[in-house]
């Protein structure tokens, strides 16, 4: 078995067939040679894939979200993805804070999950969202077409190909720690690559399991200490279980 065979095997499985092939190949390439056999390599890759995607997206939740949208229930759809469910009660407060200076016309939503639906509810005219699971796009895109809403979904791994789109604001919710765990230095590199003058960056203050001791302080120290000089922190606030930074590019 070589990497191509392993890639084909993983993408043929029901659990991972909707994943971005670039993500699967990246992880297989990183794991190749670390294990005694190709079988162990594939098992290790599957474990990592579950950690970055499986805990957030299931076929059942996507099916239920699509049904909720068909019934016109956007809030129920948002409740069916782990990240948007966590912030649902604070959604208005969150976006009142993010849009306090101005309401953007075009938003880039990086590793978007189902969050673009919240932007639709806020009346954002144009949204470009990317994620590593095609099922998310398959849920949101038909809804956007029905509503004649300018939404584009890209199946894209930002560690393999940074977004080339331009916008007024980028949302990077709870993503940077995951990127940094995958590749050291990639989190700040992503911010530098984005073609928007302003960004909203968030960090979890608790894990999905509810543990949160020291998380907020640790993430704040890491982010504020490592943010490149070309950025300025405009504001920050803890809302619900997220620490939110509003930053802008200088010059």
Swiss-Prot record:
- Gene3D superfamilies from the xrefs? DNA helicase RuvA subunit, C-terminal domain, Vaccinia Virus protein VP39
Q: Where, by residue number, does S-adenosyl-L-methionine bind?
A: 56, 81-83, 87, 111, 131, 157-158, 173, 182
Residue spans crossing the bilayer: none
Task: List, in alphabetical order, the GO biological process terms annotated in this UniProt record.
Answer: response to antibiotic
Q: Which SUPFAM superfamilies match?
A: S-adenosyl-L-methionine-dependent methyltransferases
Provide the E.C. number(s) assigned to this enzyme: 2.1.1.179
A Gene Ontology molecular function term of the record: rRNA methyltransferase activity
Reactions the enzyme catalyzes: guanosine(1405) in 16S rRNA + S-adenosyl-L-methionine = N(7)-methylguanosine(1405) in 16S rRNA + S-adenosyl-L-homocysteine
Name the keywords, alphabetized.
Antibiotic resistance, Methyltransferase, Plasmid, rRNA processing, S-adenosyl-L-methionine, Transferase
NCBIfam families membership: 16S_rRNA_Rmt_B, 16S_rRNA_Rmt_gen
Q: What does this protein do?
A: Specifically methylates the N(7) position of guanine 1405 in 16S rRNA. Confers resistance to various aminoglycosides, including kanamycin, tobramycin, amikacin, arbekacin, gentamicin, sisomicin and isepamicin.
Which protein family is it in?
Answer: Belongs to the methyltransferase superfamily. Aminoglycoside resistance family.
Q: What is this protein called?
A: 16S rRNA (guanine(1405)-N(7))-methyltransferase
> Which species is this UniProt entry from?
Serratia marcescens
Show the taxonomic lineage: Bacteria, Pseudomonadati, Pseudomonadota, Gammaproteobacteria, Enterobacterales
Gene of this entry: rmtB
